[in-house]
C-alpha cells in the first residue's frame, strides 16, 4: 500500500499587543485547550498549536515556517481577540499551504450575568474574525471557512473533511505519472497540457516506451510470481476455469510495473492497448491490484485521470476510489441509470462482493486472453470527477451520483461494474455533463464528496463545476458562460 506522510496542521491564533501580556497568555492557554479538544475528535491528522500571532513580522515568519516545513499540510487560523488585518498581509500573500479560517469563540454562550469589558477585551472573535475575513477577501486568498463552537461535532467533522483535500494538495508535488505509450490515437479529451499541469498541480508526467516496462517484467522471478499469486488467492476468489498461466502473466506484469514505478518515485501510471509491443496481455488484474494499493491509473494514456485518481486516493485514504468509465445506459424514463465499467481496469475497492479472478478473451489489443477481477459494485452516494483541459485553463467537473445494487448478471460481459443514477437524473445529468465537456473516464469515489473536490479545486486554483440535485440546466449553462468569461482574466 502506498503510504502518505503523517502530516500535521498548524493552529495559529490572532491577537495584538494592545491588550497586554496577561491577555495574550490567556489567549495562548485557551488556544491550547481548543487544540487539545479537537485532537480528541476523529481527525485524520494532528493539529499542533504554534503561536499567538501579534504583529506582522511574527505572522510572516510563521507562514513561511509552514511553507518550509515538509510535515505541515496547512494552517488553521482563529482570531481570539481583534487582530488588525494589515498585520496579516505579508504572511498571507506569501503563504503557500492550504488555509482554514475557524470562526469560533472560546465561550459557547453569552455570560449574561457576568459579562463586562474585561470579558469583551479577551473574547472578540465575533468581530476579530470579520476583520480577518475582510483581508482574506481583499487578497482573494483560497480559504475554507468553518463556523461553529469548537466543541460541536459538526466543527470537528468539517475540519476533518477539509484536511483530506489539503493533504492531497500538499502531496500534489509528489505525484508523478509514468505513461507507458502515448494517448490513444485521435482521442481528444485524454490529451492535455502537461507543462501547465505541473505548474498548476505540481504533477510530473513522463513518457516511457513499452519496452522499458517489458525490460522490468523480464527481470521478474518465478518466486516473486509465486508470492504474489499467494496474495491473490487470499484477497480474491479464483474461477476454477481460469488459466493459471494467464493469471501468472498478470502477476508478472504487476511486479514489473511496481518495480519500475517504485524505483523512480511514480505513484500513478497509464497504459494504452495500442502500445503493447513485447507484452502477452493487456494489463488487467495487474492494474486493478495496483489501484487497490493506492496507485493512480488512467486507461488509453489518460494521465489527467491517473493523477486525479491518485489525489483522490489520498483524500479517501485509499478506500472506495478508482477509475471509471460511462459504459452504457439504462434509458428507461422511470429508471435512468449508468452502468460504469471498463475493459479490465476497475478498482476492487469499489466492490460490494468479493472479486473473482477470471480469464476471458478481449476483443481489442490483439493479445492473449487477460486475467481480470470481476465483481459487482457497492451502493450508496458517490462522486464521478473529470478533469479536462479547456485550452486556457483546466476544468474539474463533479457529478454527485447515487449508486444502486447491481441485481442482474452479465454472463457475456465479464467485467467489474458499478451502477448509478446521476443527479439530478440521467437525462439532466448527462446533458449537463456533456455541456461542460466532461470526459468518458472519471475518478470515482464513495469516500470523497463534492465539497472536498470544490475545496481542492479552490486550493489549486482551477475552475470547478458541480452537477447535483440542485442543478437547473438553464442556470448551469449560464454558469459555464460566466465562468469561461471570468477565467479569461
Curated annotation (Swiss-Prot):
Cofactor(s) listed in the protein's UniProt record: Mn(2+)
Report the pathway entry: Carbohydrate degradation; L-arabinose degradation via L-ribulose; D-xylulose 5-phosphate from L-arabinose (bacterial route): step 1/3
Might you name a Gene Ontology BP term for this protein? L-arabinose catabolic process to xylulose 5-phosphate
Per UniProt, the enzyme's principal EC class comes to: isomerase
Q: Which UniProt keywords apply?
A: Arabinose catabolism, Carbohydrate metabolism, Isomerase, Manganese, Metal-binding
Q: What GO molecular function annotations does the UniProt record carry, in alphabetical order?
A: L-arabinose isomerase activity; manganese ion binding
Q: Which CDD domains match?
A: L-arabinose_isomerase
Q: Which protein family is named in the record?
A: Belongs to the arabinose isomerase family.
Q: What is this protein called?
A: L-arabinose isomerase
Which classification does the entry list for the species? Bacteria, Bacillati, Bacillota, Clostridia, Eubacteriales
